[in-house]
Design a protein with these regions (language model features):
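C-terminal nucleotide
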Residues: 2, 7-50, 83-91, 95-110, ...
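A general secondary-structure junction signal
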Residues: 27, 58-60
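Conserved catalytic cysteine-centered active-site region
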Residues: 51-57
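Glycine/serine-rich anion-binding loops at beta->alpha junctions
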Residues: 61-83
Length: 174
């Protein structure tokens, strides 16, 4: 896992003016019932944490639609972290990664482990995923002194769900 030095921003504020949930991302939604929220990430986090009427806003430093840069996982990780802060809950980064996988499986049953763990735990790491646990090794960052790394958005999109349909793997951990 190699997360770049880019960020995802989620803000959550209580909606004191109306009894609606407002979600702002590339679109804006305002609904009277969380189940009606079309943004999968916002809907699942709001339902899981039983959030009252709120205004939730998403922003990110990287392209977010099928870029292959783990942006959906970064949104989910940041959204869970923001909900925890809003509710006064103290989750570890590992707990947030596990919850991200659980919540994403509600709308994308083919989700993998690597992106949520990479986004939640950061740093240069090697993850080995076993059926009932994850082995994590922190790797030396000295490689960055010897090589230049470039993260380039090609503008080409793809669906990880379509790719994962053709992969045979065990999803029992999480």
């Amino acid at each position: 896992s190699f997360p770049p030095n880019l960020y995802t921003y989620i803000t959550i504020n209580e909606n004191i003016s109306t009894d609606t949930w407002k979600v702002n991302y590339s679109k804006s939604e305002e609904v009277y019932h969380p189940i009606d929220i079309k943004n999968d990430i916002a809907r699942e986090v709001i339902k899981h944490f039983d959030l009252p009427p709120i205004i939730m806003s998403f922003n990110c430093d990287i392209p977010t639609s099928g870029s292959g840069l783990a942006s959906s996982s970064s949104y989910l990780i940041a959204c869970i972290a923001a909900a925890c802060k809003f509710k006064g809950i103290d989750y570890s980064q590992t707990e947030i990664a596990k919850l991200a996988i659980k919540l994403e499986r509600n709308f994308n049953p083919l989700t993998g482990y690597q992106d949520p763990y990479g986004c939640a735990l950061g740093g240069l790491k090697q993850f080995i995923f076993y059926p009932d646990y994850i082995l994590q090794e922190n790797l030396t960052t000295s490689i960055f002194k010897n090589y230049n790394f470039f993260l380039v958005s090609t503008g080409i999109t793809r669906s990880s769900t379509n790719i994962l349909k053709n992969v045979n793997f065990d999803k029992s951990y999480g």
